[in-house]
Structure formats: structure tokens, C-alpha cells
Amino acid sequence: MTIGVVGRKCGMTRVFTEDGVSIPVTVIEIEPNRVTQFKNEESDGYRAVQVTVGERRASRVTKAQAGHFAKANVAAGRGVWEFRLEGEEFQVGDQINAEIFQAGQLVDVTGQSKGKGFAGTIKRWNFRGQDNTHGNSVSHRVPGSIGQCQTPGRVFKGKKMSGHMGAERVTVQSLEIVRVDAERNLLLVKGAVPGATGGDVFVRPAVKARG
């Protein structure tokens, strides 16, 4: 099974093994992923399944989205996401839950990291600060030189400087599923996953574990 699911980060807690070892885990709620569209190689050039989760008021759904959901006979969700398929078969209207995973399985979790706003180079790139004394004046946290002189006469692309930090797509690979609660549609994943509590995350079987 290579397909993933859309979940919601609930927060972190810990569970204990039979030996009394404490394992920090992130609780991910896997809301029912409703299949809204099935794409195949003949019509779309690739095989994939499109899903939606949650609910959205009719006043917040555009006419195009309303028609798309109505065609699939699926309640409007808060968005649509797509997962590539290999050998799986799904029908429009099917639901995908946490049952597709099992304890001990390795997964990749993708989410949007917490936004930190405008950050300096010390916080953003782990630069060291300059001297506190020895003639240094009002330059304790500045990065210093950002380039050369007339040659090349410009700042190279990719130069680490101050700027917006966080709020970007981040994937943490090969996290172990400690427990699967099929009744409450919960996944307990070992370690931390990107994003704030309540944010959407995408859980897929680990790429590095397929081989």
C-alpha cells in the first residue's frame, strides 16, 4: 500500500512500553478521506486518487468546487488533495481511514512548519554573534559582509540573510507508527511532526522503507 492520507495534528503525548520505556508520540487524527476523483493513465496520463476531508459550509464553496463535489456525490470538504497510486483500486465515494496503516510501519509526514515571521541570521541560519566588546558597537547580531568588491559586484543567489522564517512545507521521513486506534481513527507516531496543533498533515508510507 503506497497511498497516503490527510490527517490533523492533535498534539503530543507519550506512551509506555511493557518494559516501562517512555516513548514521545504525536497524535494524528485521520479524518475519513473521501475519494472525490480517480485519475487513470488513459485520461490523465497517470494514476492517482483525489480526496477531501472535513466539512465546509455551502456559502464557502465556489460553484466550480460545488459542481466537482456534486459530481462525485461527496460532501464538500475543506480542500482537495491527491495521492499517486501504484496497484491500488478505489472508487469515487470510497473512504480511506487509519486502518490502512499498522503498528511498526514507517511513514513520512509532511506539514507546514510554524511561521516565525521576520528573523535574523542568528535565529534563521544559526550564525554566531559578533564580539560583545573589543570595539564592537551596535553590531552584535549583524551578519557581517555579504559579498566581495567590484568582482563579482553582486550578492550571489542563495546567500543566507535575514528574512521570513518558517511557514514552509516540511517532510520528516521514516517515523515509526507506535499505535493505531482504528475506532477513533488515530495514529500515534513516534517523535515530532511539522506544524502547529490543528494543522493538516499528510501521512505516507516511508519512501526509504519501500526497497
Swiss-Prot record:
PANTHER family: 50S RIBOSOMAL PROTEIN L3, LARGE RIBOSOMAL SUBUNIT PROTEIN UL3C. NCBIfam families: L3_bact (TIGR03625). One of its GO terms (molecular function) is rRNA binding. One of its GO terms (biological process) is translation. GO terms for cellular component: cytosolic large ribosomal subunit. Keywords: Methylation, Ribonucleoprotein, Ribosomal protein, RNA-binding, rRNA-binding. One of the primary rRNA binding proteins, it binds directly near the 3'-end of the 23S rRNA, where it nucleates assembly of the 50S subunit. InterPro entries: Ribosomal_uL3, Ribosomal_uL3_bac/org-type, Ribosomal_uL3_CS, Transl_B-barrel_sf. This is Large ribosomal subunit protein uL3. Gene3D superfamilies: 3.30.160.810, Translation factors (2.40.30.10). The modification N5-methylglutamine is found at residue 150. The keyword Ribonucleoprotein applies. Pfam families: Ribosomal_L3 (PF00297). Belongs to the universal ribosomal protein uL3 family. It comes from the Bacteria. The keyword Nuclease does not apply.
